[in-house]
Amino acid sequence: LLTYAFVVFNLMYPGADFAGSIFGFAGFGLSLPEGWDSSNYNAGYTYFTDFIFQAMFAATAATIVSGAVAERIKLGPFITFSLLYVGICYPIVGMWKWGGGFLNELSTPFYDFAGSTIVHSVGGWGALVGAYLLGPRIGKYTPQGMKAIPGHNLPMATIGVFLLWFGWFGFNGGSVLSADPGSVSRVFVTTSLAAAAGAIGALIVSFLKFKTYDITMVLNGILAGLVGITAGADQMGVLDSVIIGFIGGGLIVFSVVFFDKIQIDDPVGAISVHLVGGIWGTLAVGIFGNLAGWGQLYSQLLGVAAVGLFCFATSWLIFFSLKRTTGIRVHENEETEGLDINEHSMRAYPDFASKD
């Protein structure tokens, strides 16, 4: 939040002087353009509500990475990565569209209503690079095959996903940037339908593939539906949102299997949900809804490619530099014992700890 306040906000929204460009900067700190009134910044919101809302989006991009590198990354290097990635990569990408940059000035402007690419794919690319350079958790992949390492509390994970679903009403609904009941209610409906359809898509595909009802796939299917609808939540109809969510949920199953096959260990499926789901949702804007068309699809492809190349290169540079200097992975003994006691000198679940 502090980084976003002092550097990132004015890097992401540098002003009209940088329209159509790939980079701009309006100075450090929070400061209104000359002559503007903070209480009348825009018809639907103020300067400071805009700041705090967008700051939460930036935080989201960083937290996406944490899931893919869980249980083996050093805390210090991860904090360093988060500061640099959110401080440099995220605002530059955001400026390309939301700050009036080159993606917004295409003949058919790139469209990303609430961040399938600008938030979720940005986090997903960082997650992919981080998981690859860290390597898998101890015992995840053996000569005998892949070993499942289940989460410690599936009911809590389920509650967490439903809390995320509820939070998405603020994520997508807030992106209307006004309290207009017609627009906000439409976004609420498309968001919820996509989430529900994502659950069904993941349930059906996982059952056909594994012959069991895999609740973890269903939970990630919900999230994939939410990520997928985020790019065009204000442009989709009822059937559009159901199709986008259903396909997104089904894609998750194949994506999780694919990344396990190439031995990229992602404990929570963050890469599949946010990167794969974000790409799908961004492309879906050119296929479904009010903006569908070849010109829009081309712009969406261009946006996905530009953001992907920049984010991959930036996250690789940061993670690789940290790996060569401070190191990014904890010692094998620390990983086996658990990061809570070694990084924080305390345990999350002391009643279940060894009494040696």
What are these model-predicted stretches?
Residues 1-356:
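Hydrophobic alpha-helical transmembrane bundles of multi-pass membrane proteins
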